[in-house]
Amino acid sequence: MRKKLYILIVFLSLMTNVFSQQKDGTYNFLNMTSSARVAALGGTILPVSSWGVDIQAAASNPSLINSAMNTSLSLSYVDYYQDISFGAIQFGKTFNKIGSFVASVQYGDYGDFYYSDETGVQENTMFSVSDYVINIGWGRHLSKQLSIGANLKIAGLQHENNTSFAIATDIAATYINNSNWVFSLVARNIGSELSNNYQSWRNELPFSMLLGASKRLEHLPLTFIFVYDNLQKWDLIYDDPLDLENNYDPMTGTLKEKSKIDVFADNFFRHMIVAGELNLGKNLVLRVGYNYGLRKNMISPTKKGAVGFSYGVGINVYKFTINYSRSEMHIHGSPNFITITTNLDSFKF
């Protein structure tokens, strides 16, 4: 018991000490998910029961890694925008004495680009842009109600002849109370850039802290999910200098003052993500999510559309689970996610 308590104290101390890290940086792809299920439910973390077998949730919340993921294999593909695409593979393995592990590789391909001279004239040669993340995740249960986990990530970028490398870690804890509420606390991208060949300073990593909660209803197969993103930064409001939402007085040119209640509410809900997951039997799952902050940042004042919403479906076919989702990020296009998961042990005879 003392050993478990010591491990928990170490995890909480690490989370407390990283609040001062920067939010934004070159490595924003570290926060991108390739999981169709995660994308459908808001795109950040899943604060769900860690006694499940869904290896998709492990990359964003390592405290969900458990022995049920042993020999699980997951393949994901994301059709992003234009020629941009992402792919990922995950595999789980459990060792009795030290815990369960999930290894994953995510690769992003941004396409090929023509070189141009200073006047904008294109040349005949081209260059490519890509990035990758190699991740080793570990998770362990300290009790029937409490689990912890961590990710160790190596990230790299190649933009033409420019390259850079970084190392980062995520730490997480998940707690399930007696009323079947699930709570997860995750600190992501604690680390630093190791090297780059195009500037004299180091790029910051996009550190963030997230608090999530979920509740599965007792008499209905519906799970509600709530995530509070960016615990480390309160003010997320961006004042558009182009004033597309008519926030400035046209006569005086001054910013229209909002009430303190309006500012507080706007900031609060920019942190919030809400989602729901409905199980229709054993072989079909429907999902929907809403990200208010994404909607406020990406919406067009002239055509609002469904920006900020995400939705998806999951089906079990034979020994495979197939998940599809779509995230409405902009009125001019939205990414499509597909993930196929299986367990290799199920094919043994």
Can you name each region flagged by the protein language model?
Residues K4-M15:
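Sec-dependent N-terminal signal peptides
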Residues T16-S20:
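Sec/Tat signal peptide C-region and signal peptidase I cleavage site
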Residues Q21-F349:
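Subset of outer-membrane beta-barrel
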Residues M1-L5, K144:
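Positively charged n-region of N-terminal signal peptides that target proteins for export
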